[in-house]
A protein has these predicted regions:
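Metal-dependent phosphodiesterase/phospholipase catalytic core, i.e.
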Residues: 1-90, 94
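Hydrophobic faces of well-ordered beta-strands that scaffold small-molecule active sites
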Residues: 43-45, 68-72, 88-97, 118-122, ...
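Solvent-exposed loop/turn segments at secondary-structure junctions
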Residues: 48-52, 74-77, 98-99, 125-128, ...
C-alpha cells in the first residue's frame, strides 16, 4: 500500500527512462520538480486536485501557479467554489469519460453553462460517434482537446505503446 511507503524510501528510488533504464536521478519532491520547471513549461500535476490547497501553497511560494494544470472530474460549481477560496488559481481541466454516464453528464453541464475551459481531457476506450461528437463540440466551443495517450484504455488504443510498437503516424495521426 502506498500509505505504508516512507518518505525516505521514496527518496532512495532512482528514476528510469521510458524504456526502463535506470538514471542517476533520484525521485524529486514536488517542490524540487517545480523549481526545475519554473518559467520553462506547463506542468500537469496529475491526481493533484485532492491536494489543491497544498499544491497551490507550494506553487504560490515558488511563483509558478500560472504554469500548473490540475485536472479532475468535479462539477462546475465545485470548481468555482474551490477557486473562490483563493485570489489566484492553477489552470483546471475537466476530465470527461464520454462513454460513461457521469462523463456525459459533466460535459453536458459545462456545455449548458457555457463554460469553455482551456482544455478538456476526453477519455474513451472505443472510438464511437459519441466520442467524435464530443471532440467536435470541444473544439467548436473554443477549448483545446487533451488526449491521454499513456494508457490504451483512456484513448481507444491510440496510446504511446501502440505508436512505439508500430507506425507513430498511423496512431497519432488519428488524434490530430
Amino acid at each position: 500500500r502506498v500509505c505504508d511507503i516512507t518518505y525516505d524510501s521514496i527518496r532512495r528510488c532512482v528514476l528510469k527512462t521510458g524504456h526502463g533504464v535506470k538514471t542517476t536521478h533520484r525521485m524529486p519532491t514536488l517542490r524540487e520538480a517545480l523549481e526545475v520547471c519554473k518559467d520553462r513549461i506547463v506542468v500537469n500535476v496529475d491526481q493533484g486536485y485532492e491536494y489543491y490547497d497544498l499544491v497551490l501553497a507550494v506553487t504560490e511560494e515558488l511563483g509558478v501557479t500560472d504554469q500548473i494544470l490540475i485536472k479532475g472530474k468535479r462539477s462546475t460549481d465545485a470548481v468555482a467554489a474551490k477557486f473562490a477560496e483563493h485570489p489566484r488559481n492553477m489552470m483546471y481541466m475537466p476530465i470527461i469519460d464520454i462513454l460513461k454516464p457521469q462523463g456525459r453528464a459533466l460535459f453536458a453541464e459545462y456545455q449548458e453553462k457555457g463554460i469553455a475551459p482551456l482544455a478538456y481531457e476526453v477519455c474513451w476506450n472505443k472510438y464511437t460517434p459519441e466520442v467524435k461528437e464530443c471532440m467536435d463540440k470541444v473544439v467548436a466551443g473554443g477549448s483545446k482537446l487533451w488526449v491521454n495517450s499513456l494508457w490504451a484504455s483512456l484513448c481507444g488504443g491510440l496510446d504511446d505503446d501502440a505508436a512505439f510498437g508500430g507506425d507513430p503516424a498511423e496512431v497519432y495521426g488519428k488524434l490530430v
